[in-house]
Amino acid sequence: MPVVQNACSFVRLLASGRDRAKFLHNFCTNNIKALETGSACEAFFTDVKARILAHGYVLAFEDAHEIWISPGDPAALLKHLNRYIITEDVAIVADNPSSATLCFHADENVLTALRAEQVAIGGDELSDGAIAAAVDQTLSIRFGIGEAEQNTAVTGLLVTWAKQPVLFLTGPAGPLAALGSRLDAAGVSALSNDEIESLRIDERYPLMGRDMASENMAPEAERNVQAISYTKGCYLGQEPIARLDAMGHVNRALRVVEISGPCEVASASGCPLKTTDGTTAGTLTSVILRPDGISHGLAMVKVNSIHQPLHVTDDSGNERMVHVRSA
C-alpha cells in the first residue's frame, strides 16, 4: 500500500510550550485559542499585508499543537514564526522529513480496522462517534501502532472534503506503509493520488505553489468560512482581511471549473482562461480527468468574468469551453 507522495501530502511543524496556542492564534487567521484538545481547524498564515505564507490545518493536543501545511516552503514559515518568539514559552520545530501520509474515505470500517491496530496514547480517540462528529467539525487524533513497548506514534486529521469525511494519517514512512498494507489486506484501501486530487478540487482546497502563491491574499481562496475568523481579534494580517470583508468581495477568486471534454492534464495547468473576445479572465491552476471523461480543476478567475463564457487552450492546441462553478 503506497503512502501519498504527491502534493496532497502534508508537512508538519510541531509547537510546544504553555504559550503555543496564544502565539499561533496571533499569527494565523483562525481562532486557535478556541481549539479544544482533539479538535483542529483550517487556517492561513499571512504576512502583515495578508499575503499567504502557508495554508493548512492546526491540530490541538494536550501537550502540543501541530501545523499541517501543503508541501512548499515549510522552512520559510518556520523562520517567519520563530523570528517573533521573544519571551513566550513556545518552541516550533519541523517534523521528521521522512514522514509520509495515508488518506482514506473515513467510515466505520476504517475506524474498526485502526482500533485493531492501535496502541492508545491517551484516551479512546478512535471512538464510534468520531465519523459522525466529523460531519460538523474537524478532529485530530493521535494513537500508536506496533508493540506497546516500542510503538510508533501516528497523527490523524479527520475533515470533510466535498461533503465526504476524509481521514489523513501521518507518521514515519516505513511503519505507515506497513500499516497501509495491513489495512489493505483487511479490506480497507487507501485512496489513490487521483482520488485525493479529485476530492481536493471539488472541495476547492488550494495547494500553495500551484493554486495560490505568496502574492495572493488569503480571502482570494474563498475559504473564509472554513479558515478565517472575523471575531477572534487582532492577528498579523487582520486589518487588510477586515477591509476586504467590508468591501464585500475580492477582485479575483479561486473557483472550481468544469472543462468540456478531456484536457491535456500535464500541460493545462497554468494555461490562461479567455473570454470570447480574447481577454484573459484567469489562470487554470489544477486539473484532473474524471472517469466520465470530463476534466475539472481549479482556476484563479477575475470575479467580473465568472459568469462570462470562457475557454482554455492547452499546449496541444485543444480548445475547451470552461464553466465556472458557483462558490
Give the residues covered by each predicted segment.
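Anionic-ligand-binding alpha/beta catalytic cores of soluble enzymes and soluble regulatory domains
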Residues: T170-E258
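Acidic, low-complexity central loop/insert segments
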Residues: V3-Q5, V11-R12, Y57-L207
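Short, surface-exposed ligand-recognition loops at beta-strand->loop->(often short) alpha-helix junctions
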Residues: L14-F23, F27, F104-L111, E258-S267
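A generic structural signal for short beta-strands and their flanking turns/coil linkers
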Residues: S9-V11, C41, D63, E88, ...
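Glycine-rich, small/acidic residue-mixed loop/short-helix segments
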Residues: N216, E222-I228, L236-Q238, A242-A327
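Residue-level signal for inorganic ion chemistry
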Residues: G17, I67, F104-A106, L169, ...
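Short, solvent-exposed amphipathic alpha-helical segments in soluble enzyme
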Residues: F27-K33, L81-I86, L183-V188, D245, ...
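Acidic, proline/glycine-enriched N-terminal capping motif
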Residues: M1-H55, L59-E62
